[in-house]
Amino acid sequence: MKDKLVKAIAKDGQVRIIGAITTELVNEGVKLHNCAPTAAAALGRMLTAGALMGTTLKSEKDTLTLQIHGGGIAKGVVVTSYADGHVKGYIGNPTADIEPNSKGKLDVSGIIGKNGNLLVIRDMGLKEPYIGQVPIYTGEIGEDLAYYYTVSEQTPSAVGLGVLVDKDLSIKSAGGFIIQMMPGADEMLADLISYRLEEIPSITEMISKGMTIEEILEYIFEDMDLKILESIAPEYRCDCSREKVERALASIGQKDLKEIYDEGKEEELKCHFCNKAYVFSHDEVGDILENYYSEK
């Protein structure tokens, strides 16, 4: 089943919903970073969250970055997303893997840790990006984002994120949703939705059964006048280039760049988001020194 993201409303706009199936997207990210099972679940949840949240951006030039650092062996997860639904991300330690938790599930919280913060950074081309930050609530990512929305944006929200890792380490199913109550929404409605979310199967279970994202949302919001407003194809896509990596190399400063040049060797840099390697010869390092630091 192709990945798909939809935006919807229910109950005459009292509820705003973004839902997605992200199996292929997550599989691509997990393969690029060669993730162990628990690391795959952590990165996959963050990538799914990024895809969902990125579509709330107003301009295609805007970016949304999610960071979670909890002091655990995952060594943090970073995801950057865009308005068109494409995302990229990385986990500090792709080999992070521990025993399943007491429910027999991959222990994402156990590798993320709970001693740290979740950051949401919106760069809208202004002088300074908007940064929202909350302490990690559980380390399971979905609950942390729901806590962020409630505390930092004063929007009561439910966030469901799921990643099912197969025995061959490929992603069997992945997806998620963000459900938000709009100002003035009926409190009884919020209670009803909370009850339904407790009763439904996990999102990965529903995706594995072949349900589309529309069918999943119709199941949750039965008799609530669900209206699909927009459909987007999310994907994992890195926009790195030799020019960007060259600027990153130049940004380390003249002194460090001169040391690299004086060693007389080539310099290899890898993109954090896709692991693509960029090699700069000794002469090219010299050219960068000349172009960025010579006195004009």
From Swiss-Prot:
Chaperone is among the record's keywords: yes
Swiss-Prot/TrEMBL GO biological process terms: protein refolding
The record's account of how the chain is modified after translation: Under oxidizing conditions two disulfide bonds are formed involving the reactive cysteines. Under reducing conditions zinc is bound to the reactive cysteines and the protein is inactive.
Disulfide bonds: C238-C240, C271-C274
Keywords for this protein: Chaperone, Cytoplasm, Disulfide bond, Redox-active center, Zinc
Keyword Zinc: yes
Biological role stated in the UniProt entry: Redox regulated molecular chaperone. Protects both thermally unfolding and oxidatively damaged proteins from irreversible aggregation. Plays an important role in the bacterial defense system toward oxidative stress.
Localization per Swiss-Prot or TrEMBL: Cytoplasm
Classification via SUPFAM superfamilies: Hsp33 domain, HSP33 redox switch-like
InterPro entries with a match to the protein in the record: Heat_shock_Hsp33, Heat_shock_Hsp33_C, Heat_shock_Hsp33_N
Any Pfam family hit: HSP33
Protein name (database record): 33 kDa chaperonin
Residue stretches in coiled coil: none
CDD domains for this protein: Hsp33
Main location group: cytoplasm
One cellular-component annotation, GO: cytoplasm
